[in-house]
Amino acid sequence: IILNDPDAMVVVIPDLYPPNVAFTHSTAKELFEGIQRNFLEILHQKKVKDEKSFIQRLKVFCFKYDLEALLLAAEDERRKFLGMKFLKRQWTIPVEDQNHENPPKKIVEKLFQKSGNQYNQVIDAPLILKKCNDWDIAEACQQCFKPFIEFLECVS
C-alpha cells in the first residue's frame, strides 16, 4: 500500500514489554530505532528509491507496556467496573514507568483477583476503556500514549 499510494502512512504501535522480542531492545528509543532499521531493510530488499519519503511516512508509537498501562491510568473507570469503592494504589505513577518484573498486565490481573474476578483482556479492557476520555488517559500516559493521541487528532 505504501509503495503505491504516496499519501499512505505506516503506523506501528508495538509494546516495549516484553523486551528483546524480534530484536534487542529495552527502551522505547531502542524499539523505535529497531523498527526503523527493519523498515529500511525491507525498503532495500524491494529496491525502493527515495527512502527518505517512506521513512517520513513511518510513524512509530512505542507503548511501554500492553494496554493494561492505560487501564492503570483509568483509575475511576476501572474501580467502578470492579465494583470497588476504594483501591489502594500499589503501582508506580506515571503508569508508564512500571518495571518489567511487575508489568501493568500483572498488576491489573491482581486487581481483578482482589475484586473476585478474573481479568480477560479481550473483554474487560474495551469495556473499561470505552468509558474513558482519551485525553484524560493521555495526560496520565504522557510518554507514549499522548503522542499517539496527538497524532490521531492531526490526521482526523
Language model: regions and residue ranges:
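C-terminal accessory helical subdomains adjacent to catalytic cores in phosphodiester-
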Residues: 2-156
